[in-house]
Protein backbone atom coordinates (compact mmCIF):
# COMPACT_ATOMS: atom_id res chain seq x y z
CA UNK A 1 0.00 0.00 0.00
CA UNK A 2 1.29 3.43 -0.91
CA UNK A 3 1.22 6.14 1.74
CA UNK A 4 1.83 9.84 1.25
CA UNK A 5 2.67 12.02 4.26
CA UNK A 6 1.84 15.74 4.27
CA UNK A 7 3.51 18.32 6.51
CA UNK A 8 1.50 21.37 5.42
CA UNK A 9 -1.73 22.94 6.65
CA UNK A 10 -3.49 23.28 3.30
CA UNK A 11 -3.67 20.98 0.28
CA UNK A 12 -4.08 23.45 -2.56
CA UNK A 13 -6.19 23.54 -5.71
CA UNK A 14 -5.43 20.75 -8.19
CA UNK A 15 -2.73 19.49 -5.82
CA UNK A 16 -2.51 15.97 -7.22
CA UNK A 17 -4.44 16.31 -10.47
CA UNK A 18 -2.52 14.71 -13.34
CA UNK A 19 0.44 13.98 -11.08
CA UNK A 20 2.36 10.74 -10.68
CA UNK A 21 1.21 10.64 -7.05
CA UNK A 22 -2.40 10.70 -8.20
CA UNK A 23 -1.94 7.37 -9.92
CA UNK A 24 -0.36 5.59 -6.94
CA UNK A 25 -1.43 7.07 -3.58
CA UNK A 26 -3.94 4.86 -1.77
CA UNK A 27 -4.05 6.35 1.71
CA UNK A 28 -3.95 9.82 3.25
CA UNK A 29 -3.95 9.98 7.05
CA UNK A 30 -3.01 13.32 8.55
CA UNK A 31 -3.38 15.22 11.81
CA UNK A 32 -2.17 18.60 10.53
CA UNK A 33 -4.14 19.43 7.39
CA UNK A 34 -7.07 21.76 8.01
CA UNK A 35 -8.11 22.63 4.44
CA UNK A 36 -8.44 20.52 1.30
CA UNK A 37 -8.90 22.84 -1.65
CA UNK A 38 -10.75 22.53 -4.96
CA UNK A 39 -9.84 19.53 -7.13
CA UNK A 40 -7.06 18.56 -4.69
CA UNK A 41 -7.60 14.81 -5.18
CA UNK A 42 -9.81 15.01 -8.27
CA UNK A 43 -9.72 11.71 -10.14
CA UNK A 44 -7.22 10.02 -7.81
CA UNK A 45 -8.33 6.58 -8.91
CA UNK A 46 -6.09 4.63 -6.49
CA UNK A 47 -7.09 6.53 -3.34
CA UNK A 48 -8.88 4.24 -0.87
CA UNK A 49 -8.78 5.93 2.54
CA UNK A 50 -8.78 9.53 3.74
CA UNK A 51 -8.65 10.42 7.43
CA UNK A 52 -8.26 14.09 8.26
CA UNK A 53 -8.31 14.45 12.02
CA UNK A 54 -8.28 18.25 12.00
CA UNK A 55 -9.77 19.06 8.60
CA UNK A 56 -12.32 21.87 8.96
CA UNK A 57 -12.80 22.75 5.29
CA UNK A 58 -13.14 20.72 2.10
CA UNK A 59 -13.84 22.49 -1.18
CA UNK A 60 -15.62 21.79 -4.47
CA UNK A 61 -14.70 18.62 -6.35
CA UNK A 62 -11.82 17.84 -4.00
CA UNK A 63 -12.62 14.11 -4.14
CA UNK A 64 -14.78 13.85 -7.25
CA UNK A 65 -14.07 10.74 -9.29
CA UNK A 66 -11.97 8.94 -6.67
CA UNK A 67 -13.44 5.64 -7.80
CA UNK A 68 -11.55 3.43 -5.31
CA UNK A 69 -12.24 5.60 -2.26
CA UNK A 70 -13.95 3.44 0.37
CA UNK A 71 -13.45 5.26 3.68
CA UNK A 72 -13.50 8.93 4.66
CA UNK A 73 -13.29 10.34 8.16
CA UNK A 74 -13.34 14.01 9.09
CA UNK A 75 -14.09 14.09 12.83
CA UNK A 76 -14.31 17.89 13.21
CA UNK A 77 -15.71 18.96 9.82
CA UNK A 78 -18.90 20.98 10.34
CA UNK A 79 -19.78 22.29 6.87
CA UNK A 80 -19.82 20.17 3.73
CA UNK A 81 -18.50 22.38 0.93
CA UNK A 82 -16.84 19.59 -1.04
CA UNK A 83 -17.89 16.76 -3.28
CA UNK A 84 -17.56 13.00 -3.12
CA UNK A 85 -19.37 12.81 -6.45
CA UNK A 86 -18.80 9.62 -8.43
CA UNK A 87 -16.89 7.97 -5.59
CA UNK A 88 -18.45 4.68 -6.60
CA UNK A 89 -16.68 2.52 -3.97
CA UNK A 90 -17.45 4.76 -0.98
CA UNK A 91 -18.95 2.74 1.89
CA UNK A 92 -17.71 4.21 5.17
CA UNK A 93 -18.41 7.87 5.94
CA UNK A 94 -17.53 9.31 9.35
CA UNK A 95 -18.71 12.91 9.79
CA UNK A 96 -19.76 13.11 13.46
CA UNK A 97 -19.69 16.92 13.70
CA UNK A 98 -21.20 17.76 10.32
CA UNK A 99 -24.06 20.25 10.60
CA UNK A 100 -24.56 21.49 7.05
CA UNK A 101 -24.46 19.77 3.64
CA UNK A 102 -24.60 22.63 1.19
CA UNK A 103 -23.16 21.26 -2.03
CA UNK A 104 -25.49 20.40 -4.86
CA UNK A 105 -23.90 17.04 -5.70
CA UNK A 106 -22.20 16.20 -2.39
CA UNK A 107 -22.51 12.40 -2.60
CA UNK A 108 -24.10 11.99 -6.02
CA UNK A 109 -23.53 8.58 -7.63
CA UNK A 110 -21.83 7.08 -4.59
CA UNK A 111 -23.38 3.82 -5.66
CA UNK A 112 -21.81 1.61 -2.95
CA UNK A 113 -22.94 3.81 -0.06
CA UNK A 114 -25.53 1.87 1.94
CA UNK A 115 -25.68 3.85 5.16
CA UNK A 116 -24.86 7.33 6.38
CA UNK A 117 -25.10 8.52 9.98
CA UNK A 118 -25.25 12.30 10.47
CA UNK A 119 -25.57 12.87 14.23
CA UNK A 120 -25.60 16.68 14.19
CA UNK A 121 -26.80 17.58 10.69
CA UNK A 122 -29.42 20.35 10.72
CA UNK A 123 -29.41 21.46 7.07
CA UNK A 124 -29.22 19.88 3.61
CA UNK A 125 -29.42 22.04 0.51
CA UNK A 126 -28.10 24.98 -1.47
CA UNK A 127 -30.97 27.40 -0.97
CA UNK A 128 -34.61 27.22 -1.97
CA UNK A 129 -33.95 28.55 -5.48
CA UNK A 130 -31.67 25.68 -6.46
CA UNK A 131 -32.09 21.95 -6.94
CA UNK A 132 -30.03 19.78 -4.62
CA UNK A 133 -28.96 16.28 -5.62
CA UNK A 134 -26.80 15.55 -2.58
CA UNK A 135 -27.51 11.79 -2.64
CA UNK A 136 -28.83 11.48 -6.19
CA UNK A 137 -28.22 8.04 -7.71
CA UNK A 138 -26.89 6.59 -4.47
CA UNK A 139 -28.48 3.36 -5.60
CA UNK A 140 -27.57 1.34 -2.48
CA UNK A 141 -28.51 3.94 0.14
CA UNK A 142 -31.11 2.30 2.37
CA UNK A 143 -30.29 3.94 5.71
CA UNK A 144 -29.99 7.62 6.60
CA UNK A 145 -29.77 8.52 10.29
CA UNK A 146 -30.44 12.09 11.44
CA UNK A 147 -29.93 12.09 15.21
CA UNK A 148 -30.17 15.80 15.99
CA UNK A 149 -32.97 16.81 18.34
CA UNK A 150 -33.33 19.86 16.11
CA UNK A 151 -35.10 19.08 12.87
CA UNK A 152 -32.84 18.99 9.81
CA UNK A 153 -34.04 21.57 7.28
CA UNK A 154 -34.28 20.49 3.63
CA UNK A 155 -34.19 22.93 0.72
CA UNK A 156 -35.15 20.61 -2.13
CA UNK A 157 -37.03 17.32 -2.50
CA UNK A 158 -34.55 15.97 -5.07
CA UNK A 159 -31.89 15.24 -2.45
CA UNK A 160 -32.69 11.49 -2.37
CA UNK A 161 -33.92 11.08 -5.94
CA UNK A 162 -33.14 7.73 -7.56
CA UNK A 163 -32.27 6.09 -4.24
CA UNK A 164 -34.03 3.26 -2.39
CA UNK A 165 -35.50 5.96 -0.14
CA UNK A 166 -37.32 7.63 -3.03
CA UNK A 167 -38.41 4.20 -4.29
CA UNK A 168 -39.88 3.13 -0.95
CA UNK A 169 -37.29 0.56 0.10
CA UNK A 170 -34.95 2.76 2.14
CA UNK A 171 -35.57 4.63 5.38
CA UNK A 172 -34.70 7.83 7.22
CA UNK A 173 -34.27 7.38 10.97
CA UNK A 174 -34.96 10.38 13.20
CA UNK A 175 -35.84 10.93 16.89
CA UNK A 176 -39.33 9.73 17.77
CA UNK A 177 -40.30 13.20 18.95
CA UNK A 178 -39.68 14.63 15.47
CA UNK A 179 -41.38 12.01 13.29
CA UNK A 180 -44.60 13.98 12.80
CA UNK A 181 -42.72 17.22 12.17
CA UNK A 182 -40.67 15.62 9.41
CA UNK A 183 -43.73 14.00 7.86
CA UNK A 184 -45.59 17.32 7.80
CA UNK A 185 -42.67 19.40 6.52
CA UNK A 186 -43.14 21.04 3.12
CA UNK A 187 -40.15 19.22 1.59
CA UNK A 188 -39.60 16.20 3.82
CA UNK A 189 -43.23 15.16 3.41
CA UNK A 190 -42.32 13.66 0.02
CA UNK A 191 -40.58 10.92 2.02
CA UNK A 192 -43.26 10.77 4.74
CA UNK A 193 -43.71 6.99 4.55
CA UNK A 194 -39.98 6.35 4.86
CA UNK A 195 -39.45 7.86 8.31
CA UNK A 196 -38.74 5.60 11.24
CA UNK A 197 -37.98 6.34 14.89
CA UNK A 198 -34.37 5.81 15.93
CA UNK A 199 -35.55 4.48 19.28
CA UNK A 200 -37.45 1.64 17.60
CA UNK A 201 -34.49 0.30 15.64
CA UNK A 202 -31.48 -0.12 17.97
CA UNK A 203 -30.12 -2.90 15.78
CA UNK A 204 -29.80 -0.42 12.92
CA UNK A 205 -29.17 2.88 14.67
CA UNK A 206 -27.28 1.76 17.77
CA UNK A 207 -26.65 4.27 20.52
Language-model features: where?
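Short, aromatic/basic amphipathic alpha-helical patches
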Residues: 156-163, 180-193
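Alpha-helical elements of the RecA-like P-loop NTPase motor core of helicases
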Residues: 82, 135, 180-183
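A structural signal for leucine-rich repeat
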Residues: 85, 107-108, 129, 135-136, ...
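Low-complexity, Pro/Thr/Ser/Gly/Ala-rich linker/spacer regions in secreted
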Residues: 198-207
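Structural signature of tandem-repeat unit edges
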Residues: 1-13, 19-38, 44-57, 67-78, ...
